[in-house]
Amino acid sequence: MERVSVASGNLAEIGYDPATETLEVMFHQGGVYQYYNLPSFMHERLMQAESIGKYFNAEIKGHYPEARV
């Protein structure tokens, strides 16, 4: 999955596949995780958030199925 760099203290890169509703996040500390069944509007809100890290922690982490890849 293609990812883009983001300005965040915790998240380094973010990718999204709308066909499978999968968000992929690479963290600065090295882990890569995928979050499943995430609607495209949530990805859009994440990318437009004033603080990507805060939005991710409040709205995505723990709210969608995830797996380390």
Model regions and ranges:
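A charge-rich, low-complexity, intrinsically flexible signal that marks solvent-exposed coils, linkers
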Residues: M1-Q34, H43-V69
